[in-house]
């Protein structure tokens, strides 16, 4: 049937900030949906709080609201559009993850959707309830002829304990309506049951948990299905988890299609999945169903269902080329599967199920090193921060590619020293799921363990173990062969081994370069195959490629002949990780779109299945490949070889994807690959402290005193000369990796040892730490002559908090005209001194009226999307054009940049935008179950960001906090405990809270100071202080755990006070989901936000409206 004619205006809800369990796959799906709906002539309103998303670019919706995704704010959007005579007809909430779904449910249940006549499309309320509510779903599975794990839904701890007594330990605890397994876990004791179920009841919006029998160790599978209004159903993809049940699917290595199912088992799973889909009632969209199979007897049970586009949907889309989100959006507005044409073939309908003639492997990326003390055991609560995907003609080829795509310290088997111990130690490690267990599987096999013993220890299916065992056998051949001949080398490449891995086994080849030389001499290059959804039955219209080393030397590549347009290769940012996330993908996507429009043929290279950059229609050609020197060079080689004539490859862009492509710049340039934009030598100049220090001295720009050290003695001497505290860090890092503020010699000695191990080829940098300075961030463009200031951001937290974790305001709220003039002058001098062509990010610290230069990065920064949204100027697009030869004057004339002026000075009536970091502390626990510390420092820990934008700072800050963590309290009790150095600064904000009606609790020293300043407060004792007669009986931590505290202000004591007490306070706040502020500036900002909330005049405005006010550039 044709699309519905009664729908004219659709509201799409995004997923908000990148968090563990809900990442940029929903930007990918939401962007597709918005494109589809607008192409169909529908008006689109969008709500999403994440400025780093492509979907919040103004061109993707008619009304783009960068506002908190809460029922209250979404209702304001619906009401505003209705008041303007532009009624919203339908709400599409199935493409924004659990956040969007929960918000839609709340709007339905509160009567808001009925009040404004808004229909839920994609999945109606009943379908959502049937799919998400544990008990109802269990009944549906039984009705469909399936089986669920024995379980019971519990609403109280008494019911939980009763159920555990019936089922026996261990049990699995699962809250309803949460994502990423938040609050779930396997409980082996009654204490663990109490802890997990208590947390689960708190995490579930519906305040219930499912207690179910443990199926730990069973095999796990997923099906991605779609259904239309005529009851046509397609199974898009089957996915198998390599890790068994007990490890969250987001933390497991997964494979598509499923490898170890028999045809009978697959058909049974498929039939049951379709029956469940029909019973649940998802009739215009997609869903994901998870199954478990007992490897001993084949018993099949249904675990759960997501009645929406999920993380696995994005993986299935990229794995098959079947655009699930795009088709789901079309189904939601009335189309049927047979009416939708498959974009990739251009002739088959969407009711044709995809067929794969390749294997896809996804692997998770973790960040445990960022959270010392966190338990690294993998459980049913998701902990990975990103993922990589690869495609190959066989499992081991795809596995090898994905392992090097992760960009960890190990780039595949045999690329790092083995851990100590023998077979038994390796098998012992395998019994506890943890990051990198594939390496232990290979090691145990190499040391002589049988496939059966390794399978028993790990719970991994013997088929996968046997595949890795074949690699062990191949390794033995490679080591033993007298000469590495063409046949053996081709076989090694066919099995996914990199030149680096082969070089580690053949020392006589003198490293990776030697292996490459031999390969080139023997004519061994990969061929590039095409993802076409139909195993080559129909010709693909969209060039989406992956590499494979075929055993047949005559195998042909499928890269299309080159056009007459010059080509530009854009290197993406790889898997998301802390310090390098969606913000860099945003810049890569902007480069692809603007350069295509400017007459270039754009070629994207990336390996992240969650991103918009790896959508098949973002660039003119896509290579789903690891971002290593070898793999990128082969793509360049393939592009140069594809067809004759034409201008060839104009250059490679390394400046937009973060540290990953930047780290390849020198080697690529040395190999003859043209790097466009800022040259590699200039990048080196900015990274080299000595050379950069000379540049600053020549320009008369102050910088904190510093020194470089390779030994503890050198570091101690430098620290004594410049004075403690000092900031120590390794060179060439992103996200503040390994940074620390050091207050004394003992701490310095411990750091030097660790830092040297972290980056042995680079020295340690020791800087004077500027306490109480205001940190400033600047994004600027330079075309080699003119500098354009994109935006000047003032950090809310003081210097010492990593810029990625600090909230910031744009335009700056406390900087004067003279400060901004200093910033402009310094930025221009640095851009010209380095030789920047493209983007530049500079960080400054302002202390006692002196502007110090902290660092300069001649590349796209993580703040580029935020600045672009706040100022209406697309900096990444302008950067891409400049790198390919355009001037700032030319871009002003075209309207891409402001015709006059730049982002250094905002219009008088410009709104204030606040960026806030989103931190994942609640996801991690120590081995004893306690929460980890939420203290911020120079090492970045945030996974994502939100933006609040309004007419004044208080309102914008309030929005940013609501979007990131939930509303700031408007009343209640605030607990205050601060370091001596912060007590004077805290008097005003705490007094204001007391005047607003808050009750103040404080520990003895802080309470005494507050009372002396006329602030009434009640005492609580410190956590480790014993109870004494006449002293408070309740400790600060007791009060927080008892739910008597609504906000915590706790600044750290450095090395001069009771740090352990601060940890207990902050971790209790994290565990109770209570706002916890750890800086004086953060407390002052929070007070302004609370005041704005109490005034109650915080409204909503679309970006399009705000950009007209700013007088920015229409894109």
From Swiss-Prot:
Residues that hold Mg(2+) 2 according to the record: 304, 306
SMART domains reported in the protein's UniProt record: CPSase_L_D3 (SM01096), MGS (SM00851)
Name of the top EC class for this enzyme: ligase
Region (Carbamoyl phosphate synthetic domain) location: 560-965
Region (Carboxyphosphate synthetic domain): 1-407
Residues that hold Mg(2+) 1 according to the record: 290, 304
Chain residues that bind ATP 2: 729, 768, 770, 775, 800-803, 843, 855
Catalyzed reaction equations: hydrogencarbonate + L-glutamine + 2 ATP + H2O = carbamoyl phosphate + L-glutamate + 2 ADP + phosphate + 2 H(+)
Region of interest (Oligomerization domain), ranges: 408-559
EC number: 6.3.4.16, 6.3.5.5
Keyword line: Amino-acid biosynthesis, Arginine biosynthesis, ATP-binding, Ligase, Magnesium, Manganese, Metal-binding, Nucleotide-binding, Pyrimidine biosynthesis, Repeat
Positions with a binding annotation for Mn(2+) 1: 290, 304
Binding positions for Mn(2+) 2 per the UniProt entry: 304, 306
Residue span, MGS-like domain: 966-1113
Region (Allosteric domain): 966-1115
Cofactor names: Mg(2+); Mn(2+)
Function comment: Large subunit of the glutamine-dependent carbamoyl phosphate synthetase (CPSase). CPSase catalyzes the formation of carbamoyl phosphate from the ammonia moiety of glutamine, carbonate, and phosphate donated by ATP, constituting the first step of 2 biosynthetic pathways, one leading to arginine and/or urea and the other to pyrimidine nucleotides.
Domain notes from UniProt: The large subunit is composed of 2 ATP-grasp domains that are involved in binding the 2 ATP molecules needed for carbamoyl phosphate synthesis. The N-terminal ATP-grasp domain (referred to as the carboxyphosphate synthetic component) catalyzes the ATP-dependent phosphorylation of hydrogencarbonate to carboxyphosphate and the subsequent nucleophilic attack by ammonia to form a carbamate intermediate.
Similarity annotation: Belongs to the CarB family.
Official protein name in the record: Carbamoyl phosphate synthase large chain
Organism: Mycobacterium tuberculosis (strain ATCC 25618 / H37Rv)
């Amino acid at each position: 049937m044709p699309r519905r004619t009664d729908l004219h205006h659709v509201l799409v809800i995004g997923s908000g900030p990148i968090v563990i369990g809900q990442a940029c796959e929903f930007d990918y799906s939401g962007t597709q949906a918005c494109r589809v709906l607008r192409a169909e002539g529908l008006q689109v309103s969008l709500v999403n709080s994440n400025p780093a998303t492509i979907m919040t670019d103004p061109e993707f919706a008619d009304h783009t609201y960068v506002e908190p995704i809460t029922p209250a704010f979404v209702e304001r959007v619906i009401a505003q559009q209705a008041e303007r005579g532009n009624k919203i007809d339908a709400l599409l909430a199935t493409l924004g993850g659990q956040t969007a779904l929960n918000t839609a449910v709340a709007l339905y249940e509160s009567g808001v959707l009925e009040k404004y006549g808004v229909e839920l499309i994609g999945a109606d309320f009943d379908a959502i309830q049937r799919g998400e509510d544990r008990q109802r779903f269990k009944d549906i599975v039984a009705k469909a002829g399936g089986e669920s794990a024995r379980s019971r839904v519990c609403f109280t701890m008494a019911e939980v304990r009763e159920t555990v007594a019936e089922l026996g330990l261990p049990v699995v605890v699962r809250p309803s309506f949460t994502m990423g397994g938040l609050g779930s876990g396997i409980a082996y004791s009654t204490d663990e049951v109490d802890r997990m179920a208590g947390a689960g009841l708190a995490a579930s919006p519906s305040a219930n948990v499912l207690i179910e029998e443990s199926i730990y160790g069973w095999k796990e599978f997923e099906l991605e299905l779609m259904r239309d209004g005529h009851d046509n159903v397609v199974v898009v993809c089957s996915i198998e988890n390599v890790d068994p049940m007990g490890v969250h699917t987001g933390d497991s290595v997964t494979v598509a299609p499923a490898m170890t199912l028999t045809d009978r088992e697959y058909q049974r799973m498929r039939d049951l999945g379709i029956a469940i889909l029909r019973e649940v009632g998802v009739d215009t969209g997609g869903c994901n169903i998870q199954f478990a199979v007992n490897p001993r007897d084949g018993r099949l049970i249904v675990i759960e269902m997501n009645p929406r586009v999920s993380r696995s949907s994005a993986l299935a889309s990229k794995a098959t080329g079947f655009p699930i989100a795009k088709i789901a959006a079309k189904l939601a507005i009335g189309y049927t599967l047979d009416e939708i044409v498959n974009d990739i073939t251009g002739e088959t309908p969407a009711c044709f199920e995809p067929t794969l003639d390749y294997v896809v492997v996804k692997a998770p990326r973790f960040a445990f090193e960022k959270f010392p003390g966190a338990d690294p055991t993998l459980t049913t609560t998701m902990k990975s921060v990103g993922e990589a995907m690869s495609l190959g003609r066989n499992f081991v080829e795809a596995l090898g590619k994905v392992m090097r795509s992760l960009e960890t310290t190990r780039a595949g088997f045999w690329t790092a020293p083995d851990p100590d111990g023998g077979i038994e130690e390796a098998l012992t490690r395998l019994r506890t799921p943890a990051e990198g267990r594939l390496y232990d599987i290979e090691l145990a096999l190499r040391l002589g363990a049988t496939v059966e013993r390794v399978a028993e220890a790990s719970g991994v299916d013997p088929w996968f173990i046997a595949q890795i065992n074949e690699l062990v056998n191949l390794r033995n051949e490679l080591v033993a062969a007298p000469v590495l001949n063409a046949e053996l080398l081709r076989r090694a490449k066919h099995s996914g081994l990199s030149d680096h891995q082969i070089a580690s086994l053949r020392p006589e080849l003198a490293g990776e370069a030697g292996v490459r030389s031999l390969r080139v001499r023997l004519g061994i290059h990969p061929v590039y195959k095409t993802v076409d959804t139909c195993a080559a039955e129909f010709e693909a219209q969209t060039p989406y490629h992956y590499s494979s080393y075929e055993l047949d030397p005559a195998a042909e590549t499928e890269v299309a002949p080159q056009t007459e347009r010059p080509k530009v290769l854009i290197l993406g940012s790889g898997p998301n990780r802390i310090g390098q996330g969606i913000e860099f993908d945003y810049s890569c996507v902007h480069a692809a779109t603007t350069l295509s429009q400017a007459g270039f043929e754009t070629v994207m290279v990336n390996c992240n299945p969650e991103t918009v950059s790896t959508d098949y229609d973002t660039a003119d050609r896509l290579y789903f490949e690891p971002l290593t020197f070898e793999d990128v060079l082969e793509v360049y080689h393939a592009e140069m070889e594809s067809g004759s004539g034409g201008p060839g490859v104009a250059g490679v862009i390394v400046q937009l994807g973060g540290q990953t492509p930047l780290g390849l710049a020198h080697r690529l340039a040395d190999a003859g690959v043209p790097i466009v934009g800022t040259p590699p030598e200039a990048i080196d100049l900015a990274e080299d402290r000595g050379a950069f220090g000379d540049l600053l001295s020549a320009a008369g720009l102050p910088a904190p005193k510093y020194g470089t050290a390779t030994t503890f003695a050198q570091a101690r001497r430098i620290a004594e000369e410049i004075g403690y505290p000092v900031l120590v860090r390794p060179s060439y890092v992103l996200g503040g990796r390994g940074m620390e503020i050091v207050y004394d010699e003992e701490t310095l000695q411990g750091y030097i040892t660790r830092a040297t191990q972290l980056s042995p080829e680079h020295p340690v940098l020791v800087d004077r730490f500027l306490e109480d300075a205001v940190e400033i961030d600047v994004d600027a463009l330079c075309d080699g002559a003119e500098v354009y200031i994109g935006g000047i951001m003032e950090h809310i937290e003081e210097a010492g908090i990593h810029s990625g974790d600090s909230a910031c305001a744009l335009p700056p709220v406390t900087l004067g005209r003279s400060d901004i003039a200093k910033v402009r002058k310094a930025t221009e001098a640095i851009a010209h001194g380095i030789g920047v062509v493209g983007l530049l990010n500079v960080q400054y610290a302002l202390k006692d009226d002196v502007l110090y230069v902290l660092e300069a990065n001649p590349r796209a920064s993580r703040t580029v999307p935020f600045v672009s949204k706040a100022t209406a100027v697309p900096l990444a697009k302008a950067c891409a054009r400049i790198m390919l030869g355009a001037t700032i004057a030319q871009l002003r004339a075209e309207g891409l940049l402001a015709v006059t002026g730049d982002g250094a000075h905002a219009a008088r009536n410009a709104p204030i935008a606040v960026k806030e970091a989103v931190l994942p502390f609640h996801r991690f626990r120590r081995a004893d179950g306690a929460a980890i510390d939420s203290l911020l420092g120079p090492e970045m820990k945030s996974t994502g960001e939100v933006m609040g934008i309004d007419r004044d700072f208080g309102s914008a800050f309030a929005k940013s906090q609501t979007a990131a963590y939930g509303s700031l309290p408007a009343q209640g009790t605030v607990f205050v405990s601060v370091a001596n150095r912060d007590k004077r600064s805290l008097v005003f904000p705490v007094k204001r809270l007391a005047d607003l009606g808050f009750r103040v609790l404080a520990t003895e020293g802080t309470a005494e100071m507050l009372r002396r300043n006329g602030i009434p407060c009640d005492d609580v004792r410190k956590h480790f202080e014993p109870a004494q007669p006449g002293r408070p009986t309740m400790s600060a931590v007791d009060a927080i755990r008892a739910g008597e505290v609504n906000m915590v202000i706790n600044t750290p004591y450095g090395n001069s006070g009771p740090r352990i007490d601060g940890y207990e306070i902050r971790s209790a706040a994290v565990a109770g989901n209570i706002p916890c502020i750890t800086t004086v500036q953060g407390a002052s900002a929070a007070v302004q936000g609370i005041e704005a909330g109490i005034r109650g005049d915080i409204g909503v405005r679309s970006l399009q409206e705000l950009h007209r006010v700013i007088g920015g550039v229409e894109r």
